[in-house]
UniProtKB/Swiss-Prot annotation:
SUPFAM superfamilies: Fe-only hydrogenase. Interacts with CIA1. The gene is NAR1. It comes from Saccharomyces cerevisiae (strain YJM789). This is Cytosolic Fe-S cluster assembly factor NAR1. Disulfide bonds: none annotated. The keyword Ribonucleoprotein does not apply.
Amino acid sequence: MSALLSESDLNDFISPALACVKPTQVSGGKKDNVNMNGEYEVSTEPDQLEKVSITLSDCLACSGCITSSEEILLSSQSHSVFLKNWGKLSQQQDKFLVVSVSPQCRLSLAQYYGLTLEAADLCLMNFFQKHFQCKYVVGTEMGRIISISKTVEKIIAHKKQKENTGADRKPLLSAVCPGFLIYTEKTKPQLAPMLLNVKSPQQITGSLIRATFESLAIARESFYHLSLMPCFDKKLEASRPESLGDGIDCVITPREIVTMLQELNLDFKSFLTEDTSLYGRLSPPGWDPRVHWASNLGGTCGGYAYQYVTAVQRLHPGSQMIVLEGRNSDIVEYRLLHDDRIIAAASELSGFRNIQNLVRKLTSGSGSERKRNITALRKRRTGPKANSREMAAVAAATADPYHSDYIEVNACPGACMNGGGLLNGEQNSLKRKQLVQTLNKRHGEELAMVDPLTLGPKLEEAAARPLSLEYVFAPVKQAVEKDLVSVGSTW
């Protein structure tokens, strides 16, 4: 290993850049302090440069770095911004606070404070209710359910269209991870047509909250929505132009929650309570706490890949789903077999190294290899025994995400349970991986599971107004192909 490369350089997840590289135009140049005779004028006062203002919108439109300058993030999306803004708004009687919390953040806080998930939930709700007079606290599962339902619907329709037209069989790519979405838009615009255009649970939750209050004749200006998310790129996601109408005012992480408690001289555990009625009392009208505080099968990032294959399996009685592991723990494929055919496949792929391989595979034009191999196997079949051998061979294969119908992509290795905003930043690589495994296990044991395929259409239909469910992709054209441009950020 090179002396210039250390283990600390291999953290392989998106973090804010240390400096902004956005080029800015300076009006006028510096005046020369030299007179007509060539003499230096020492009496001339130095010019004062204008202060440059750069916003999150500038970051989203700039291709200088992958995410954003940390300074820019903190200036508009941080716990300090929340405290300042809500401190002013709370003085107005017609304003109220709404908080949404992702399941990854709930589990991270529970693990950090040594609590059960329910105890941590109640503690968090009690804290926001008592200290900030918060009116509603919700989980993000309802937003995730609709996101999954729309994703599955679009994948099935896209696959049918490809089969009818014989179009390119390259997979669709998820856009729910803002790190991967921003990376694609800024450095790999050729992949933008492959992005499946469905918003993330964070944004759809915001849209649902806004729709709920509009149905009650409550103006958007009457509430402040704070979102608790596992990574810093969620701040950028909430600042996308098409996301501004989703009703999310500020995004913070569990790390910022802990910092905020310290600054306020508050002990999180001092808000412990056994009052489970908080789940219902802090739910908006029409929001069932058994749903929005739940989760679903398929993984801690959403389970989009798993749920798609499950949906196709329900359409084909007798089909069999198998789970295939990839070359590393950050690749998994869900493959659906029926008779001698693979009728559906979807994969999960995490970490920037795997994303780099994904980009190379999808831009090399080798998208039909597996199809040819399966056809060859089918032609060699001579009877039931051969068919059984073929099925066994397919089942024994390793994950092949590049030939899936859909790939659920996450920038962080270990996916969302390893988000940069979670309470795991001080762990070494081995302990960090063990912590992710622990949190994944707790996710399956402590959260109730609901069926997004059944609930999704019902929730969307029940919404008081049409929801904002799609992004407006903005790929940045590159004069020169870039593989990675990041300032102060090691992947």
